[in-house]
């Protein structure tokens, strides 16, 4: 068994809570948890505790929720914990150098991609969007840059043709905790090896936007299909028809030459709605019309065949 470390954990969403759960079941001592202050959530905009806070309180772990680390009080509070290490997973706050230097062994971060390929806010989504064949998690020693620190461990897995950001998120939420525990064992035993990132291979994974998720039918069908998977569960790829915004949950690419204007429906039946694109054909298989749940195209056509007649144009 490796040496037990005194760990401060910093994280906020469910992805982070799954890592905290693994730490709470390990030989390491979780001496405190940092998470973002309550934010209004849901339709009622009620102040809701983060999944990390909820889990920490269930295990009687002290919780700290500073707005930032600018005050002397917040810095002194962290220093007083006398931590060996801070583990950061999707915390959502920038950590200044004074915080990074406070724990004896510094701060490490679990990042949801293979660095340095995708640094930044949306690495899971961008790996699918770009057509990458694999992704994973990188555990790195944090520095003042954005995901630029030396890498301590990389764990990879393939991106399947059917993977969405939602399914990939779940896979990485299983892979990450396992990689984290292995990395902590190396750190505790003094055998961890830090590898510098090649900045020349780095890309920035920009945040997604609703505007970006609107389908451009002039793009190639392969790119549109990747966007549909990358933007699920948010912001959801969509198009306009009959002044209604239609969300696309599932589609496939059919390789064939097209002469029609991109966005033109060239076939619509129970096998799908076939739409001309800038290259090849995109076959829509599952859609969501306003006020309804996602349905197979066959059901959509039974209800709204008038919206999807052959020759009509999607925008």
From Swiss-Prot:
Signal peptide stretch: none
Catalysed reactions, as listed in the record: L-methionyl-tRNA(fMet) + (6R)-10-formyltetrahydrofolate = N-formyl-L-methionyl-tRNA(fMet) + (6S)-5,6,7,8-tetrahydrofolate + H(+)
Cross-referenced CDD domains: FMT_core_Met-tRNA-FMT_N, Met_tRNA_FMT_C
CC annotations in GO: cytosol
EC number per UniProt: 2.1.2.9
GO molecular function, one term: methionyl-tRNA formyltransferase activity
Binding site for (6S)-5,6,7,8-tetrahydrofolate: 113-116
Keywords: Protein biosynthesis, Transferase
An individual GO BP term: conversion of methionyl-tRNA to N-formyl-methionyl-tRNA
InterPro entries in alphabetical order: Fmt (IPR005794), Formyl_trans_C (IPR005793), Formyl_trans_C_sf (IPR037022), Formyl_transf_N (IPR002376), Formyl_transf_N_sf (IPR036477), Formyl_transferase-like_C_sf (IPR011034), GART_AS (IPR001555), Met-tRNA-FMT_C (IPR044135)
PROSITE patterns tied to this protein: GART
Keyword Lyase: no
Function: Attaches a formyl group to the free amino group of methionyl-tRNA(fMet). The formyl group appears to play a dual role in the initiator identity of N-formylmethionyl-tRNA by promoting its recognition by IF2 and preventing the misappropriation of this tRNA by the elongation apparatus.
Family the entry assigns: Belongs to the Fmt family.
Name of the protein this chain belongs to: Methionyl-tRNA formyltransferase
Organism encoding this protein: Vibrio cholerae serotype O1 (strain ATCC 39315 / El Tor Inaba N16961)
Gene from which this protein is expressed: fmt
């Amino acid at each position: 068994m490796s040496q037990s470390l005194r760990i401060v954990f910093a994280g906020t969403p469910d992805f982070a809570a799954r890592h905290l759960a693994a730490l709470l079941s390990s030989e390491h001592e979780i001496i405190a948890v940092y998470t973002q202050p309550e934010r209004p959530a849901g339709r009622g905009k009620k102040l809701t505790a983060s999944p990390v806070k909820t889990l920490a309180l269930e295990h009687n772990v002290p919780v700290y929720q500073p707005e930032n680390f600018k005050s002397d009080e917040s810095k002194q509070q962290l220093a007083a914990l006398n931590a060996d290490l801070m583990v950061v997973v999707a915390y959502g706050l920038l950590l200044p150098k004074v915080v990074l230097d406070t724990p004896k062994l510094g701060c490490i971060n679990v990042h949801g991609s293979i660095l340095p390929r995708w640094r930044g806010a949306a690495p899971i989504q961008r790996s699918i969007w770009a057509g990458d064949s694999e992704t994973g998690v990188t555990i790195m020693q944090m520095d003042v840059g954005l995901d630029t620190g030396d890498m301590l461990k990389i764990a990879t897995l393939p991106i399947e043709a059917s993977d969405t950001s939602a399914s990939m998120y779940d896979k990485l939420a299983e892979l990450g905790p396992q990689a984290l525990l292995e990395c902590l064992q190396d750190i505790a035993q003094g055998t961890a090896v830090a590898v510098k990132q090649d900045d020349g291979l780095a890309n920035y994974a920009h945040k997604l936007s609703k505007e970006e998720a609107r389908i451009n039918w002039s793009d190639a069908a392969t790119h549109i299909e990747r966007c549909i998977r990358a933007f699920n569960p948010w912001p959801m790829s969509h198009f306009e028809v009959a002044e209604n915004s239609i969300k696309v949950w599932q589609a496939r690419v059919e390789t064939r030459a097209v002469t029609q204007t991109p966005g033109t429906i060239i076939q619509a039946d129970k096998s799908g709605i076939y739409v001309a694109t800038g290259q090849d054909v995109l076959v829509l298989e599952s859609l969501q019309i306003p006020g309804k749940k996602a349905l197979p195209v066959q059901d959509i056509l039974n209800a709204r065949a008038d919206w999807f007649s052959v020759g009509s144009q999607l925008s």
